[in-house]
């Protein structure tokens, strides 16, 4: 009995202290070394020894992929400068907007069921320097590692599943909130500036714009004439800049009860950092305050800028309405965006809705008094989008659907 007790304690200690630092393949492992080092430089050498195995594996795999990405980075960059793909106003991207865990993944997957739309896949956003000329190598060496990256703990991941293009901006050189939120928690203040772009220097903003546009250009090469569908929660705070970069772009915003979003983001950040952080996390209260401020500021940016979007290029939906009547809401969205909606499109969307409906949903503990106070500060968002407290029970039942 005593030996069993000791064995149990050893396993519990390992789960608590060892597992978080195991060197899983990092989502930046297919980014070339120059992009990885651009992110790591911001840590100012603050890598606790417990994270060194994870750091070493990241640098090793990145070094291999640096060589693999060279042909595409040299050849395709020159090709795009000489013959950039044309993007007309009537074929500008469709952007899915909404804060993290508001239902953006569910909405993106529904839209991606439309054969006329093309979302980037996970290999494309995680290896933005390699996915055209280097696809054969990428498919052989990296795609089998996708299940090991632990991204699927927070979002559906697969070689052909729709992905967030902000991962591409991160893996092109840390131009994303993800670099702070998932990789360097102690440097969130620096990387969070790429969320709404307001505090960037002129050079930083120019670099972000050029990389965002270049990534869309590369996607256009492999889209086969289809309209691009892009989803990243950070785009919610970038509407003004996206309209400048992509005239004629269309936007669909999804909202959810602020309490449910807040709860789910606590889980999201914890799991991201558990899998990918190279530094110790911030104290819980400090991280929750960052989430609260960021969530409120993101949606306020959107509310301030949505009047700039032409009426025919803009639609909004609430997650609970999309769950209750997916086809009714999708048909309404298509009408408001003036996009064609086919019978085949409806059948594929119904399959997506059924798949997401069967997914396991997370349960979260009750809020503390401090967390309740933070949720109360988000009440303006519930009023703005009609996500009143009366629907919180429904949102808890829906769980974490993106």
Regions found by a protein language model. Give the residues of each.
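Conserved phosphate-donor/acceptor-positioning beta-strand/loop module used by diverse small-molecule
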Residues: 231-232, 242-267
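Short His-Asn-centered micro-motif
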Residues: 97-99, 229-233, 319
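PAPS-dependent sulfotransferases, especially Golgi type II membrane carbohydrate sulfotransferases
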Residues: 2-70, 194-198, 203-209, 216, ...
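N-terminal signal-anchor transmembrane helix
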Residues: 74-96, 125-129, 134-137
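Glycine-rich phosphate-binding P-loop
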Residues: 96-112
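Post-Walker A helix-loop "phosphate-sensing" segment adjacent to the P-loop in P-loop NTPases
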Residues: 113-123
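Flexible loop/turn segments at secondary-structure boundaries
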Residues: 236-239, 259-262, 323-326
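PAPS-dependent sulfation machinery
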Residues: 125-228
């Amino acid at each position: 009995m005593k030996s069993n007790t000791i064995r149990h304690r050893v396993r519990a200690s390992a789960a608590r202290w060892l597992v978080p630092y195991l060197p899983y393949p990092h989502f930046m492992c297919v980014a070339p070394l120059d992009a990885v080092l651009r992110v790591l430089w911001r840590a100012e050498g603050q890598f606790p020894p417990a994270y060194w195995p994870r750091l070493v594996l990241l640098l090793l795999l990145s070094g291999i992929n640096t060589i693999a990405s060279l042909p595409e980075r040299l050849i395709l960059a020159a090709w795009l400068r000489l013959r950039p793909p044309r993007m007309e106003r009537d074929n500008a991207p469709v952007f899915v907007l909404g804060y993290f865990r508001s239902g953006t993944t569910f909405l993106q997957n529904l839209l991606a069921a439309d054969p006329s739309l093309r979302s980037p896949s996970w290999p494309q956003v995680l290896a933005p320097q390699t996915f055209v000329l280097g696809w054969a190598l990428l498919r052989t060496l990296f795609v089998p590692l996708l299940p090991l990256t632990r991204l699927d703990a927070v979002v559906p991941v697969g070689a052909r599943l729709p992905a967030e293009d902000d991962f591409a901006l991160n893996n092109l050189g840390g131009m994303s909130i993800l670099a702070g939120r998932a990789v360097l928690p102690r440097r969130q203040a620096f990387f969070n500036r790429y969320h709404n772009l307001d505090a960037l220097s002129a050079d930083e903003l120019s670099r972000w714009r050029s990389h965002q546009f270049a990534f869309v250009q590369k996607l256009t090469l492999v889209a086969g004439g289809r309209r691009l569908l892009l989803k990243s929660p950070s785009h919610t705070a970038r509407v003004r800049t996206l309209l400048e970069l992509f005239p004629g772009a269309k936007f669909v915003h999804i909202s959810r009860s602020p309490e449910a979003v807040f709860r789910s983001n606590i889980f999201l950040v914890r799991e991201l950092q558990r899998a990918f952080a190279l530094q110790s996390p911030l104290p819980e209260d400090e991280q929750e305050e960052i989430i609260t401020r960021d969530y409120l500021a993101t949606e306020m940016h959107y509310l301030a800028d949505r009047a700039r979007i032409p009426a025919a290029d803009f639609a909004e939906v609430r997650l609970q309405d999309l769950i209750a009547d997916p086809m009714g809401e999708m048909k309404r969205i298509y009408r408001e965006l003036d996009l064609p909606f086919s019978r085949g499109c409806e059948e594929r969307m119904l399959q997506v809705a059924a798949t997401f409906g069967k997914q396991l949903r997370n349960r979260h503990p009750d809020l503390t008094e401090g967390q309740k106070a933070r949720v109360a500060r988000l009440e303006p968002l519930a009023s703005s989008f009609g996500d009143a407290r009366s629907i919180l029970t429904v949102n808890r039942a829906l769980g974490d659907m993106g």
